[in-house]
Regions:
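Serine-esterase "nucleophile elbow" of acetyl-processing enzymes
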Residues: 1-54, 61-65, 78-81, 89, ...
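Generic structural signal for helix capping and beta-alpha/helix-loop junctions
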Residues: 15, 58-60, 144, 192
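Residue-level "edge-of-site" marker
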Residues: 54-56, 188
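Short active-site-adjacent helix-start/loop capping segments
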Residues: 58-62, 98-100
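Alpha-helical cap/lid subdomain in secreted, periplasmic
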Residues: 70-220
């Protein structure tokens, strides 16, 4: 049976492309040759199955008063059960948690991730006889240039970049507390349109790094 990797995330997992000139199809979503989840599948090979679960606007545990069903915690049981059995759960969330209307800070976002991972680890969706394996990824911090993009800045709020810079510290602490794995994706390139979404190169960088980690994690 193939080793199953489920990737839960937001628009950076769905593959949103803020700069159509950076996307081969010149659209608003990177294609199957560009998205990090698809690149990860190709890098790992046929012995693995990589499933992408990306939704633009998704948060860890914080309901959005404007857009419904954005917090993955509220339906994570059904989501995980629909993809059983799972060998490794990869979660890259947090960017949308920084929105001003959600009233968060880095510590609270870290607690949100902790609550989500704790819940996920209790769901009966893991390979029989195997312990839950989770990789928490801190998304690249939002660039200060985001504040110059009127519509995006209004949606996110002026403090979003600063809040996002503090997420990795708390995600790392959460991973250590729960005995799961952690990756800081700050090394991945983001675009200079909204300063939040990965470029094609950023997707490639992320896929390459995760592909290095997966065999080590699953060998434990």
């Amino acid at each position: 049976m193939k080793k199953h990797i489920l990737c839960i995330g937001d628009s950076n997992t769905h593959g949103y492309c803020a700069d159509p000139m950076d996307c081969a199809d010149h659209g608003i979503r990177f294609n199957e040759d560009e998205r990090w989840t698809c690149r990860l599948q190709k890098a790992l090979g046929p012995e693995y199955l990589v499933t992408e679960e990306g939704l633009s606007g998704r948060t860890t545990v914080f309901p959005d008063p404007i857009n419904e069903n954005m917090d993955v915690l509220s339906y994570v049981y059904a989501l995980l059960k629909s993809h059983e059995y799972i060998d490794l759960l990869v979660i890259m969330l947090g960017t949308n948690d920084t929105k001003e209307r959600l009233g968060t800070n880095p510590f609270v976002i870290g607690k949100g991730m902790e609550r989500l991972v704790r819940k996920a680890m209790t769901v009966d969706c893991w390979q029989p006889g195997k312990q839950p394996k989770v990789l928490i990824i801190a998304p690249p911090p939002i660039g200060e240039g985001m504040l110059t993009n009127g519509p995006i800045a209004a949606d996110m709020g002026k403090n979003a970049p600063a809040i996002s810079r503090g997420i990795a510290e708390y995600y790392k602490a959460t991973a250590e507390l729960l005995g799961v794995h952690f990756l800081d994706a700050a090394f991945c390139q983001f675009n200079e349109v909204d300063y939040m979404h990965l470029t094609r190169q950023g997707h490639a960088q992320l896929a390459e790094k995760i592909a290095q980690l997966v065999p080590e994690i699953l060998a434990e």
